[in-house]
Amino acid sequence: MAEQPSIPFRTTGSRVLHPLSVFLNVPLDQVNFAVCQLFALLAAFGFRLYLSPSRAGPVVRHVVMTMIGICLAIFCFGWYSLHIFIEVSLCYFIMMKANISNIHRYSFVAAMGYLTVCQISRVYIFNYGLLSTDFSGPLMIVTQKITSLAFQIHDGMGRKDDALTTDQRRLAVSARPTLLEYCSYHLNFLGILAGPTSNYKDYIAFIEGNHINIKLIEDHWKQGGYTKFPDPSPLRAVANKMIITLLCLVWFTGITKNFPISYNVDDKFISENSFFWRLCYLVISVHASRPKYYFAWTLADAVNNAGGFGFNGLDKNGNLRWDLISNLNIWNIETATSFKMCLDNWNIQTGAWLKSVCYSRAPNFSTALTFILSALWHGVYPGYYFTFVTAIPITLTARAVRSNFRHYFLSSKTLKVFYDIITWASTQLALCYIVTPFLLLATEPTIKFYKSMYFHFHLLCALVLPVLKIRNWMMVEKIAKSNLTSLNVNSFHAVPRFQQYKKEQ
């Protein structure tokens, strides 16, 4: 998208840090967010040390979590934070009054509907949302929690156990939460600003102090005769994540601003450079845009870990895992050799939410419906829909290519390495092509971008996918005919044997 004119930024949040914003030349809402997250990090350490389950009961822990979370929301978003509180209140009323058989439907419609109305108002009423505080992030996290909890209550109270999948059975909630539990789950200071989202049962186990035992029992510590487990320290995990956060911040300030995504649709840049160099810049600019997401999600993960939330048992080497609610795996994203591998490691908790409320429950067209829900949840910028609609055929084509050709490259290590290099390069190119409209936001620059790229991935999918589908169909027909011929031959030889058997009798 073209660079926005220099217009003073308006915020509904606190202006106490405005001098710091001017000094750093960083928008005030971003300064408020960063300072509040750093405050939350310190508060989380204090919460873990002085309000641990051994020192304070669940009620006290719930109250402190909720009150600090509300204060942070008001500081960052001012009166816009009312939208968060209204959605939580509305959906709590629905949860308490709705019939169990419909609780998930009503909650889903109410939460997604309210989120969508707020996003429409930001984009189309308040000047594309670029000159006002963005409160949609926390609202998106709250929407995930509201809808996932509603489905989990429906699973636990309205469905038979044998009708549930393994994950649904594990996460099913057998009683409606109290008002305090509900508010604490949605408004706690560990995750109100940047999430990540978490499952209700995991959060309640953390508040009540059962989360360590549950995870270590899952890792079979009972086999060693343990009945009580030590409280693992998150310091190492938090330190590692803060180092990553700082590196991402350095990358963002030093690299990202020098490779703006909007340059991909600059008329002069398009006219003066070849397709190859435009493709190279596309890859560089998209990769340069990732650290801001890495920064926000890794910092959010560190905040939760500092409070003691996020412990996920032990790995195969016996090391502590603090990735229960981690939202990304940077190494796996950057080295992904398939579109699926990247999706599985990017915005992980949102992917789990989409699977829980849509993909695993949709009777038909689960992939398309999941992408549509993802686009709707992200917002109403046209670029989001270009991204997710484009992702559908590319995903289907990638699956078809993998199923048709991967087995040819598994016969030797050299071929496998060659296959991995080719699939890594093609995956990164495809991802850059897919996500650029997401970053450009608007329709006009998106169409200009597609034209500058000659719609090459769209055309490639349109040509390759039908051919591979026909090839698969022909192979299935060939195998079916081969099996039928084999069956007929065996039957032909069986007749004389049967007749000979009758004569011998």
Regions found by a protein language model. Give the residues of each.
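Non-catalytic, membrane-anchoring transmembrane segments at the edges
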Residues: 1-505
